[in-house]
Amino acid sequence: MYSDTHFHYKLMTEEWGINGLETLETMAERNCFFGLDIGTKADDLFERQSVCEKTIAQIKDTKTADKVRNFLYFSAGIWPSLDEIKDRENRIEVLKKYIAEAEKGEQDTLHRKVIAIGEGGLDHHWNPGGADGRCESDFDEKVYQGERELFEMQLELARELKLPFIIHSRDAFEDTLDCLNNVGYHNGIVHCYSYGIEEARKCLDLGWYIAFGGAVTYNKKAKLEEFKELLRYVPSERFLC
């Protein structure tokens, strides 16, 4: 039995060409205990749920379909895109509205109620040519501050709703730590962890779980031993993958 704490089902199936029906059926066959579909936009929750529902409706075996409904859950959050940062006051209100509506719609077809906030946080990694829609030149001091504010708004929302938070942090550890300490809410996961042992210690001391993503499999050989030490350092009860 296993769990998957972070995937983007709509993105996987509609943009990456992954067979969603086969994926969900395989997860059910392997007795997946828990699967969390992650939000990245203030208003993407219902669309993501609808895509999952349509796939579940294609599952011919009712027991398999029930298994999928039982293990599938949803988060809602705002990844720090430039558009979301600039319109953060409005977008956080949209996020709150969607979360409230989802709670009213809890029914037997899906676990609609949001169980975590995220992913949200800070991203200062610049891909060549702004491949992910972000360029370093776009990030002046005003935008940097807006990104921090958007992150802290979501942390406050998680505290208000008593929900865990899924942190996205890339090349921005000190700023991330500052935001966490400003809000003082420490409950959740540091997703796709990409820092070192000292940073891991600080996260663990604050109470955060640490999740390792695909980087576990493709680290450069020169850094492999360093990465192995990091994996050994994180206690098994605080380790997610």
Where are the model-predicted features located?
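Mid-domain alpha/beta scaffold segments of enzyme catalytic cores
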Residues: 1-241
